Design a protein with these regions (language model features):
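Short Gly/Pro-enriched turn/cap motifs at secondary-structure boundaries
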Residues: 12-13, 99, 119-121
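Metallo-beta-lactamase
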Residues: 119, 124-173
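Divalent metal-coordination and catalytic microenvironments
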Residues: 24, 36, 62, 74, ...
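Conserved beta-strand hairpin/beta-sheet module of binuclear metal-dependent hydrolase folds
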Residues: 2-51, 129-139
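Active-site HxH/HxHxD metal-binding segment of metal-dependent hydrolases
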Residues: 18, 32, 39-116
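Short loop segments at secondary-structure junctions
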Residues: 27-29, 79, 113, 133-135, ...
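A short linear hydrophobic-aromatic micro-motif
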Residues: 8-11, 116-117, 173
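Aromatic/hydrophobic pocket-lining residues that form the small-molecule binding cavity
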Residues: 37, 68, 160, 164
């Protein structure tokens, strides 16, 4: 992998709750990853095609339905690995042959660049964030004006507090 990242990211607001689907791609290789594929992905897939991107990975921040409900649609057309935190995989209990279980501080390549995982339990036991360059894809761990709910199945306010504190203390300003 090279030192200088060539990654770009685009957000798409989808579904009745305006969830965010992220598309990350390497500008050199055109390899792409989709984060939290949910709801209608028409706009995302059209953008991918328009830019000549090659979808290579599915990344999940957590397993709630509103973040994963289009995985099967993607897998009908593509044989893609699904990256998920190991604790979330156990919590979700959904079986896919192509799950790649990650741990905190793991990293993997996308094209010629690297993406790191950060385990951020609280919203769910295996919630995670993805970090690259100066970007943080936080799923439902962190919002502009708050954090994800901790009162749903698997949520834990104390773990959320510790996760947010960890993000604050360990990410570059």
């Amino acid at each position: 992998m090279q030192d200088k990242s060539t990654l770009s990211v685009k957000t798409f607001d989808v579904g009745p709750m305006l969830n965010i689907v992220y598309l990350i791609w390497d500008n050199t290789t055109k390899d792409a990853a989709i984060v939290d594929p949910a709801w209608d992905l028409t706009e995302v897939l059209n953008f991918t095609k328009q830019k000549g991107l090659k979808l290579r990975k599915i990344l999940l921040t957590h397993s709630h339905h509103d973040h994963v409900n289009s995985i099967d649609i993607l897998l009908k057309e593509n044989d893609l690995p699904i990256y998920i935190n190991k604790f979330e995989a156990n919590f979700w209990k959904k079986k896919y042959d192509n799950l790649i279980m990650t741990d905190s501080n793991d990293s993997f390549s996308l094209g010629k660049s690297s993406i790191s995982t950060i385990h951020t339990p609280g919203h769910t036991p295996g919630s995670c964030c993805y970090s690259f360059d100066e970007n943080l894809i936080a799923g439902d761990t962190l919002f502009v004006f708050g954090c994800g709910r901790c009162d749903l199945h698997g949520g834990n306010p104390e773990e959320m507090y510790n996760s947010l504190k960890n993000l604050k203390n360990n990410l570059d300003q």
